[in-house]
Amino acid sequence: MNINPYFLFIDVPIQAAISTTFPYTGVPPYSHGTGTGYTIDTVIRTHEYSNKGKQYISDVTGCAMVDPTNGPLPEDNEPSAYAQLDCVLEALDRMDEEHPGLFQAASQNAMEALMVTTVDKLTQGRQTFDWTVCRNQPAATALNTTITSFRLNDLNGADKGGLVPFCQDIIDSLDKPEMTFFSVKNIKKKLPAKNRKGFLIKRIPMKVKDRITRVEYIKRALSLNTMTKDAERGKLKRRAIATAGIQIRGFVLVVENLAKNICENLEQSGLPVGGNEKKAKLSNAVAKMLSNCPPGGISMTVTGDNTKWNECLNPRIFLAMTERITRDSPIWFRDFCSIAPVLFSNKIARLGKGFMITSKTKRLKAQIPCPDLFNIPLERYNEETRAKLKKLKPFFNEEGTASLSPGMMMGMFNMLSTVLGVAALGIKNIGNKEYLWDGLQSSDDFALFVNAKDEETCMEGINDFYRTCKLLGINMSKKKSYCNETGMFEFTSMFYRDGFVSNFAMELPSFGVAGVNESADMAIGMTIIKNNMINNGMGPATAQTAIQLFIADYRYTYKCHRGDSKVEGKRMKIIKELWENTKGRDGLLVADGGPNIYNLRNLHIPEIVLKYNLMDPEYKGRLLHPQNPFVGHLSIEGIKEADITPAHGPVKKMDYDAVSGTHSWRTKRNRSILNTDQRNMILEEQCYAKCCNLFEACFNSASYRKPVGQHSMLEAMAHRLRMDARLDYESGRMSKDDFEKAMAHLGEIGYI
């Protein structure tokens, strides 16, 4: 059945035609090749915005540094990073006056949270730069290699369990004259080949101890690894993003938590809330501005865009901000909060894989790794790259990294930078003129409302806001920001016109088949349609069309057309046979060639439950047989989570209900990784999995509380097994012989 996708817009009000301007269905663009060029671009741009600042050489790392704070004020409209510290502090003073006690309460809460945070908080997070192997690893692995390497240097803070002692270790590690650590080296072995003459060279990954000097270690700790941002739509050029190492992560966490406590209590902040809560906050802000508008006056809204938000901000401003916010806190906590900005103002960017060059005859290609970029004649590069390298030269270090003291990398201090933006919005007026401004800020995105008696005064207010932002190192783009009468604007991809416009086109890419398995995909598909009806104003006719489109897509994906259709194919043969032999054909799942009985009333019910009473008994028995080897009962209990990719923004986690049946299979992981040096990671993971299974066998409770106390897992398990054995022995469930054997085993482990 072919359906015209534009039927999706049958019953939608005209403003929602915005949905038709987001034709984001296909695959987004992914980057390939080297990201070095994009990273160098970022380094050059960041320094250009700060080039009139104070320049000096770092005593510790020997890197070229630039400090743009209190630099010359701009005379044109070009972006600049010259934030004036006294202006930043004054803006925060005003925020403190407007919200009495907010800073103290936020600091107190952040401090109390820090005291009870355990090291395992750092295992959350995706890729983390691992200083022992100089590449990205999953956060948990990077933390593990750091802790095991720290132990070699008598730094055992992590064993205490708290984040604070581990952070103390990090500070101590920066003072050690040299650091010993475990790294992975490949040893090449020549082996005679079995099936032919000659030799095979086998690479064997070995864990070896290595050591580096203090300066080398500090440089690694301050390094950010850079990659190219993938799946970014609507842009011709890709851009670079950065991953911090484990040394920086712990300190950033606390500062962000402090800023989050502040953002939660600022009505102008679009973080950390999202979804419908954010819409409510926005609607309140609009209503408030309209009600404050002078009689006969005018209210304008600027949909704002900031030029290079991250690259014009400066860690030194953030240092001043944390110092001001934590003014009444104990000195140790103030010091703790100041570490992240200090580390960031000395950061070093790794430049990635390097450039590819071809020989003059165009026959040979070679990759030039970053340390060697300047060791070959510049004329070997193309013009564009040559120009980049010339500008990069002053900030280049011989290890193939670049010093990057000004600017922040993407996504590092979202909350704290939001506080800075809100501070600018909170000033409201300059020099008691006839206008008032207010607005909303969410990381680098903002909306500005201005009330005044006429349009000219509104424009004056907007210009004053523009200049105020310049003093804080924020550059509002005059080209990309646009102004309307209040009641129509866009903020964080939410379009407002006398209320929020339904915009489910953002979700269109996620309407497809998720590709988990047949059972989960059906549940996810229906849940997404349900969520869009609840949250994004999708109407009933649209939803009905979406269901039909989804079912068609699902049948094509899994080759499971209806049993009475004319489609041929291997799977269809089996499905047709099942169709012929089934009485209750309505009871067959769509994946087994059954009809679709989903409609708007039953979207929330898993398909197996919906069709349960319509199934033939023998079909039901096969589908839901607990001993059926294809039924993954353990992994499919209760509520599941799936990753959903909307057109804008990060991947979202979504809960869905599914009932396990023969269609709930799980695929095995790709094992082609086995011969690489990642193999150690997998073996370690398997080891952890075995430990956790053992632990679960000893403590078979459904929910684990967060462990408190200083017991190791081994002690806890031995203790529990001793108790269990004694209870079993005393109640007669265990013979004396077995009891003594059990105790002897526990004795061998060293616990009795």
Curated annotation (Swiss-Prot):
Residue positions of motif Nuclear localization signal: 187-195, 203-216
InterPro entries: RNA-dir_pol_NSvirus, RNA_pol_PB1_influenza
Assigned keywords, A-Z: Eukaryotic host gene expression shutoff by virus, Eukaryotic host transcription shutoff by virus, Host cytoplasm, Host gene expression shutoff by virus, Host nucleus, Host-virus interaction, Inhibition of host RNA polymerase II by virus, Nucleotide-binding, Nucleotidyltransferase, Phosphoprotein, RNA-directed RNA polymerase, Transferase, Viral RNA replication, Viral transcription
UniProt signal peptide: none
Source organism superkingdom: Viruses
GO cellular component, one term: host cell cytoplasm
PTM section of the record: Phosphorylated by host PRKCA.
Domain RdRp catalytic: 286-482
GO MF assignments: nucleotide binding; RNA binding; RNA-directed RNA polymerase activity
One Pfam family from the record: Flu_PB1
Residue ranges crossing the lipid bilayer per the database entry: none
Catalytic activity: RNA(n) + a ribonucleoside 5'-triphosphate = RNA(n+1) + diphosphate
EC nos: 2.7.7.48
Keyword Heme among record annotations: no
Compartment(s) of residence: Host nucleus; Host cytoplasm
Main location: host cell
Positions of the UniProt region annotated as Promoter-binding site: 249-256
GO biological process, one term: symbiont-mediated suppression of host gene expression
Family designation: Belongs to the influenza viruses polymerase PB1 family.
Subunit structure: Influenza RNA polymerase is composed of three subunits: PB1, PB2 and PA. Interacts (via N-terminus) with PA (via C-terminus). Interacts (via C-terminus) with PB2 (via N-terminus); this interaction is essential for transcription initiation.
Functional summary from the UniProt entry: RNA-dependent RNA polymerase which is responsible for replication and transcription of virus RNA segments. The transcription of viral mRNAs occurs by a unique mechanism called cap-snatching. 5' methylated caps of cellular mRNAs are cleaved after 10-13 nucleotides by PA. In turn, these short capped RNAs are used as primers by PB1 for transcription of viral mRNAs. During virus replication, PB1 initiates RNA synthesis and copy vRNA into complementary RNA (cRNA) which in turn serves as a template for the production of more vRNAs.
Protein name: RNA-directed RNA polymerase catalytic subunit
Annotated source species: Influenza B virus (strain B/Ann Arbor/1/1966 [cold-adapted])
Biological classification of the source: Viruses, Riboviria, Orthornavirae, Negarnaviricota, Polyploviricotina
